[in-house]
Design a protein with these regions (language model features):
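Conserved beta-strand in the GNAT
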Residues: 99, 105-114, 132
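Terminal signal-anchor or tail-anchor transmembrane helices
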Residues: 2-29
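Short amphipathic alpha-helix that is part of the acyltransferase structural core
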Residues: 38-82
Length: 192
């Protein structure tokens, strides 16, 4: 334990500690996700094929990103202008979209949303959303690749946990990705 004598020393110590805390907070907030990651093609492999997973790029509109997303959910009718505006919003978080591309075609995509909490010492929680693999590529392990990549990014960003919602039929897949069933999701939609 350190003891300080005199008011000047205490003010200095408080200022010094406050400065350290501000610097730590700035460093934590300035963490950026990687632009690209290499992920093993299969979970159990040590060496071998690696898949490049990268952040979404503006050009992905022309590579069929919205069509890929439509294989998962209602993607809506998004024009180039809407795409560019939404893409610009995602550049600095708190959500980050990653894709797998092969020969100019998007094979898989997923989103990591970062939530700053009061819990866990103002910790960071990652939410995995919108996991989709192109119908023609299913069964090749691309789902595992994209989930693995998003999980790594969440850990690198300092998340204390990463969570996701899935259907009952997809639960076995996410268990292969080392997720465990916990609690129940509730939803209230305001429009289709």
């Amino acid at each position: 334990m350190v003891y300080f004598q005199g008011g000047g020393s205490i003010r200095f110590a408080v200022g010094f500690v406050a400065g350290l805390l501000l610097r730590e907070t700035a460093q934590r907030k300035s963490k950026k996700p990687p632009r690209t990651l290499l992920v093993p093609a299969r979970r159990d492999q040590k060496d071998g094929e690696m898949i490049l997973v990268r952040q979404l790029e503006a050009e992905d509109f022309d590579k069929g990103f919205m069509e890929l997303l439509a294989q998962l959910t209602s993607a809506g009718n998004v024009n180039r202008e809407q795409w560019q505006a939404r893409f610009a919003e995602t550049r600095h978080g708190p959500e980050f979209v990653f894709v797998v591309e092969e020969n100019g075609r998007l094979l898989a995509s997923g989103t990591l949303v970062l939530e700053r909490k009061f819990a866990r010492g103002c910790g960071l929680c990652g939410h995995i959303e919108d996991i989709v693999v192109d119908k023609q590529c299913r069964g090749r392990g691309m789902g595992l690749v994209i989930v693995t990549a998003l999980t790594r990014v969440a850990e690198r960003m300092g998340c204390y946990k990463v969570i996701l919602d899935c259907s009952e039929e997809n639960q076995p897949f996410y268990e292969k990705c080392e997720f465990k069933r916990k609690e129940v999701q509730m939803a209230r939609y305001f429009r289709d």
